[in-house]
Every structure is written in C-alpha cells, then in structure tokens.
Design a protein with these regions (language model features):
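Accessory cap/linker subdomain of secreted extracellular hydrolases
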Residues: 30, 225-332
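Gly/Ser-rich "nucleophile elbow"/oxyanion-hole loop immediately N-terminal to the catalytic nucleophile
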Residues: 96-99, 103, 174-193, 214-217
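Short beta-strand/loop motif that positions the catalytic acidic residue
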Residues: 340-347
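Short, surface-exposed "cap/lid" segments of acyl-processing enzymes
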Residues: 84-91, 95-132
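Catalytic-loop region of hydrolases
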Residues: 23-101
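Alpha/beta-hydrolase active-site loop
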Residues: 158-181
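Histidine-bearing beta->alpha loop at or near hydrolase active sites
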Residues: 346, 367-392
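Short alpha-helix in the alpha/beta-hydrolase fold that links the catalytic acid
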Residues: 205, 337-339, 351-361
Length: 398
C-alpha cells in the first residue's frame, strides 16, 4: 500500500504548474460551521525537500526528483463528524508544502479498504508517499474514515454512503479553519480521488457536496476507481455460486451493516461455524485483510449460514439487508461535476461490470460530464497506477 501511495503522489507532480499558481485564494471569513467542525491539529513530522528527493530515488522514481519543489509539514487533524446522528471526533492526515507563496489546490484522497488500525493514515508510522504530493504544491487531505484513528472504537461503516461521505466532507470543511490557523493558502479547486473503497467513498462525498449546497463546497473534478457502486449487483454475483477470492470484504460489509444500522443480529445468523466465532477477533483492528482471508473460505456457500445464503437468493427474503444495499448504491443521483470512473476489465474482486452498470445509469439519467475509462486487462491490484497515469493530462485542463 505504501508503494501505491508513493506512485499516487508522484504521478500527479506535473499538475502543479497548471493548477496551483493562477487560481484565486480562498479568503472567505471564518464561519460558524468551520469552528464547529475543526477540533485540533498536531504537527507530527517535518520532512525536508532533500529527504523527499531521496525517497523518490529509492522507490524507483528518480525521474520525478526534479518535481519535488518543497519540503512538507505533516499534520494529524481532528474534527467533528456524525455517526448514527451523534457528534463524534474523527481524524485524518493533512500534508502541506512548506514556504509556498501561491495558493494551492486541495486534493482529498480516499484510501482503499483497510482492516488494521495501524494502517490509518493519521498514524503516520513511516513516510507514506503522499508527502511528495504536497512537495509538488498540493494540499493533501486523507481522512482515516470513521472507525479508524480518533474514532477507532466504532466498527467502520464499510460501504455506508452517508457515513462515508460525511467523513470526507466534514474533514474538508474543518481543514478550512486549519488553513487559517497555519497561514496556508488554498485556491478554489477541490479534487476528489479514490480507488476501491476509496472510489466508493469519493462518489459518496461528491454526491453529498453536489446535493447539499449548505456545505458551501464545489467539486472541480472527481475520479473514482474500481468501487462497488452498485451493491445489489455485487450481491447477485456473490449468490451465483462462484468463488470469491477476498472473503474478508464480504464479512466486512455484513458486520458493518449490522453495527451501523443497529440490527443486533447474532453472527451465527450470517456465518457458519467455525467462521462466525472467529469474526470478533479477526475484525478487532489488529489483523490485515490477508490474515483475515486465511481464516475464512473463498466459497460463499460455506462461509454464510445455509438459511441466510438461501434467503439471499429469494426475491422476498432478507429484505432489510437488500433494501440497505440498494439505498447505499448510487441509483438516485447523477454527477454534476466532471467525473471519471476507472476500472480494470479483468477485476475479479469488484467486477468491471459494476462500473459499467453505474456509468450506463448515470448517462441514461442525464449525466453530461461523466466518462467510463476501461483499463484493458487490469485487475483490482494493478489498475491503480494506469488510472493515475491517465488522470494527469485530464486534470491539467482544470
């Protein structure tokens, strides 16, 4: 993951010359909303330009060394957001270029699925690579998501549209107060980018911003890769009888919905033994996805409780779950901002067809600035870099 983040950062380095120097700085007066969302910030690292250049070299991206223009300051940001209609504290990582005199564009980057608390961005146990993003003149925001960092006592609301969106949007708003406090100049550009779960979270945040003008935000452009945007279609694939190579995702969704919606169903209603008894320990925040997978099975019929699995196949059973999956799919909204959906055509974790279905729905409902970009032969693990390579020239136009 760290290597992917580094690639993510470096590939955007050429954008700064066209997006960072000629935009109007945000100079709006502080609002009540900003005061309410912002909690605190803590400087956790200061990385000089020379170290970032060395990092680029050691990771095999020597060609980008000259694009490292600034050292960076890395902050942990705490802010208020909402979970189950109650105010909670959340956290994320903010990386800003040092001594930059021109207003910088803001990029909110939504990370892919994580299981371990150690992987929360704001823990910053080592250089992540996103420091290089800021070294090229971007203000980098990366929310931990609810369930990680400051909100680690909550079970992560995985693939829940409302909570995914608010974790991003509230951090963006809280960051405005942070900019003023630290004398950071931000221009009026806001990019949203994410892959896998981050792709889903990106669209959730975009939808929230575009449908709720009270946030006072405007998306410049959005790019989402390989997210499970149509959860009902994902369910159909799971019940088809085919194996699923990453069962940790399936267990994650069911438990997240059970917690987030306060259904309080026993795990034995969802999973067979020995898997049901393993779930609390496997999802305690100390295990990686790979470690969880090794303790589960790739056969959904063996993973799920027989009665539950049979009910999933019936149109009039497990309606509460199915309705929740439908409500958290993107079936009642059309992107207004320029939007790209990227997806590898050989993805066996989140099928390419999921993005195609979502794209076709957007177009049929009147989307004017949405594109579907297939990555031919790409899998879930290797389509991230081609996505970013394609994004560079596209984003230069804004």
């Amino acid at each position: 993951m760290i290597r992917l983040v580094l690639i993510y950062t470096l590939l955007f380095s050429t954008l700064v010359s066209s997006t960072g120097c000629d935009k109007e700085a945000l100079a709006a007066p502080e609002t009540i909303a900003e005061k309410e969302y912002y909690v605190s910030s803590e400087l956790i690292a200061s990385v000089p330009k020379s170290m970032l250049q060395s990092l680029a070299k050691t990771e095999g991206f020597g060609a980008y060394v000259n694009e490292v223009k600034y050292g960076v300051s890395v902050y942990k940001l705490q802010y208020f957001t909402t979970y189950q209609n109650k105010e909670i504290k959340a956290s994320g990582l903010v990386v800003v270029p040092q001594n930059m005199t021109t207003p910088a564009p803001v990029v909110s980057a939504q990370h892919g699925t994580i299981f371990s608390q150690r992987d929360a961005p704001s823990n910053f146990t080592s250089l992540t690579g996103f420091e290089l993003f800021a070294a090229n003149g971007y203000i980098m925001l990366m929310p931990d998501y609810i369930g990680f960092g400051a909100s680690k006592d909550i079970f992560h609301p995985y693939y829940d549209q409302k909570h995914s969106a608010l974790a991003v949007v509230d951090m963006i708003k809280a960051a405005r107060k942070f900019y003023k406090e630290k004398n950071v100049l931000a221009n009026d550009q806001l990019f949203l980018v994410g892959y896998s779960e981050g792709g889903y979270v990106t669209l959730a945040a975009q939808k929230e911003i575009e449908t709720n003008p009270l946030h006072g935000l405007k998306v410049t452009a959005s790019a989402a890769g390989a997210g499970g945007y149509d959860l009902t279609a994902m369910l159909a694939g799971i019940t088809s009888g085919a194996t699923y190579t990453y069962p940790a995702y399936l267990a994650y969704v069911l438990q997240a919905y059970n917690y987030t919606n306060s259904w309080h169903r026993p795990l034995l209603e969802y999973f067979q033994e020995p898997y049901a008894s393993r779930m609390p320990q496997l999802f305690d925040g100390n295990h990686s996805g790979s470690a969880i997978n090794r303790q589960l099975t790739t056969d959904p019929e063996e993973l799920f409780a027989p009665a539950f699995f049979a009910a999933l196949k019936e149109a009039n059973e497990e309606l509460t779950l199915k309705q929740a999956l439908q409500a958290n799919s993107f079936q009642d909204w059309v992107p207004k901002s320029p939007t790209r959906l990227y997806h590898g055509t050989s993805d066996n974790i989140v099928p390419y067809s999921n993005s195609k279905i979502t794209y076709d729905r957007f177009i049929s409902q009147g989307a004017k600035y949405t594109e579907l970009i297939p990555i031919k032969g790409g899998t879930h693990s290797n389509s991230f870099v081609p996505m970013l390579q394609s994004l560079v020239p596209w984003m230069k136009a804004f």
